[in-house]
Amino acid sequence: MKDIDTLISNNALWSKMLVEEDPGFFETLTHAQNPRFLWIGCSDSRVPAERLTGLEPGELFVHRNVANLVIHTDLNCLSVVQYAVDVLEVEHIIICGHYGCGGVQAAIENKEQGLIDNWLLHIRDIWFKHSSLLGEMPQERRIDTLCELNVMEQVYNLGHSTIMRSAWK
């Protein structure tokens, strides 16, 4: 793992490279952002939204949490959604899950891990809802299928939020 000095050095090199390519880059970026997309994704460090989509700073509004959940009581996520919809007027919302999600796997394993257990209950609910389908599968396929079902459930949650219902009126 890189130390903080390496991160700071990398950031300085990144900034320098951008200014060399486009001297007004940061000045332009400070005036406004105009993303067309809101990305709700997993906190997993292997799923970097901008890098996966090839978008630059200002082009993608991002919210990340463990297992890309959209929960009706999560004021952080809902605030991001409302800001994206009402202020930034994004055109599309992407809920991006991924195979091999550690949050989904932890929910299946049902080991005590502390505070995160409360968060994982939402995935366990999906597990129980689809247990007859999932129970017959090999472990790896079970996790991947639960990752897919989780994304579908979060799309449902988002679509039934007051924010989206108001936006669609």
Please report, for each region that a protein language model flagged, where it lies by residue.
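Glycine/charged-rich beta-loop-alpha catalytic/anionic-binding loops adjacent to active sites
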Residues: 57-68
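N-terminal short beta-loop-beta anion/metal-coordinating cradle
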Residues: 18-59
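Generic beta-strand structural signal
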Residues: 58, 91-93
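Short beta-strand segments
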Residues: 40-42, 64, 94-98
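Divalent-metal-activated hydrolytic enzyme cores
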Residues: 1-35, 67-91, 102-169
